[in-house]
Amino acid sequence: MQEYVIELSKYFIAFFMVLYTASCFYTFRYPVGEKHRGVFILQDLLMFLVQVLCFLNLSLVSGDFQYLFFFAFILIFLFATITMVSLIYENINRLLLNNMCMLLGIGLCIVSRLSFDKAIRQYVIVLVSLIFSLLVPYLLGKIHFFKKITWLYATLGIALLSTVLILGEVTHGSKISFSLGGITFQPSEFVKILFLFFLAGALWENVSFQRVVLTAIIAGAHVVILVVSKDLGSALIFFVGFVFVVFAATRNYLYLLAGLVGGGAASYLAYQLFDHVRVRVLAWQDPWKYIDNKGYQITQSLFAIGSGSWFGMGLLKGNPTAIPYVEADFIFSSICEELGVIFGICLILICVSSFLEMMRVAVCIHDRFYQLIVYGIGIMYIFQIFLTIGGGTKFIPLTGEIGRAHV
């Protein structure tokens, strides 16, 4: 009986994910801000059903009911998040809120399957992040000097990245983090926010050629520090964010063309300068030729995705740990192996719907400063997803030093 439940749940999980994904795109039929109470209640229900079936599978297959206890805490968190945020901020974008909760729940489920201890740590980080995120909209509405400290954002960003370059720990050949009190920090993630505030502050009311050049020089300083740190994935994300925010601010296609040409030239230069970039390109071109060394990681990722087929092998029934660093940049391959390619495609579409909603929200914002920030968040968000999933599926070469899609 237990085996029947486990086997049938694979198909129900895929079915509920398809319904949830369809509901995301259904909301695009209506203007931003229009309430779709029935649709969002349906999404909440589907989110709950997907989480229940996933954690039930983990408990039944492993025989360990700690997964159900963990699910109870996740459920409390998701319910509290949706309820509290909706009550405090009545005009919250429910599609983005629901998508965030869905992706968080799935992420915690998969991480708990790979490493329960890491899942607990991630859960604590998510709780702390929720507290801060509840304050951000209030602060943005009450404090009005954010537009006036443009150069402070740039100074802090460059200082943080330089600190990591000088004092950071070397992880797989890249300097990307440092530890403080046993907790590891990756400042480039925080600097992304400062970087977008800097770009918006520099360009929201002045888009002259001189201002664009000055902004490009300072943005280039961020990128160069990341390149010297060998954090090429983050450098690429910062560069793409800069190019598209400048385009959004100026509506000048020449800047976009210049950015694309410059990006191509920088990619060629990186190929010539960094040995590990050449290794990654070789592994991308023919991973099967180097399956025992350079191509091992990507071939294992492709094996995992292929073995999952449409509906997956079932949670705890695959072998995702055969992929080095699977819990980091190859988690999508793990998801496809055990939950199926249909589930994986739905995840991608949910991310795409989030990006499209961010763009729709940006169009509706009248304050140019915040509009550019939202544009930038959307671009950097979708490009980071493109790098991670594209690297793990052999759509693009991996950009990490050793075994990381983008470090």
Predicted regions, residues:
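Conserved small/polar residues in nucleotide/adenosyl-binding loops
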Residues: 405-407
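Long extracytoplasmic/lumenal interhelical loops at the membrane interface
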Residues: 305-342, 365
